[in-house]
Amino acid sequence: MNATIAATDHSLPSVVLAELQKGGLSPQRLAQAEVFCPAFFARVDGSDIHLHTPVQWAAVVGGLLGFMQQRPAGRAVVRVLSPADMHAGRSLLQIVTDDMPFLIDTVSMVVSTSLQTHAVIHPVVVASRDAAGALLSLGGTAGQAESVMHFEIDRAADAAEQEQLKAQIEAALEDVRAAVNDWAAMRDKAL
């Protein structure tokens, strides 16, 4: 199915979900995908929908769902991938963290020091996790809002550049977390 047509008639999330079902997801992961797919594609810009085929989008969504399965409380998880089957010349930067202000701007600034950003997809989903950080469910009212960020960027040259970018993003997000957590105290001190 043509991804542009699918995006126009709002069926792409259903098509991608069907692709994920073919992959034999567990019932728990399938329930997560049913919540995540609409949230993810609601944040895909119309001009970006053509970047991938439905099968490629399913790989992106499935990969993100797998990546989201474990996250320590109060910490961001970050990865940089350069999959062979994506657009030539692109790497994927993916981040899952507590939802808070300044995330996209901060990550974009770090990336822009050496690479160009081609697409940003940023759904916010309610995630319920156990004490060890394992994902229990998505959606509903239990849990807390988490930012799931998917950046398509210029291809990182090698594993060393991927690791360097990952470390820079992690450090910047720790600074954001500290600033957001301290803003009220800083404001009170300034007044």
Where do the PLM segments sit?
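Non-catalytic interaction/regulatory segments
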Residues: N2-L191
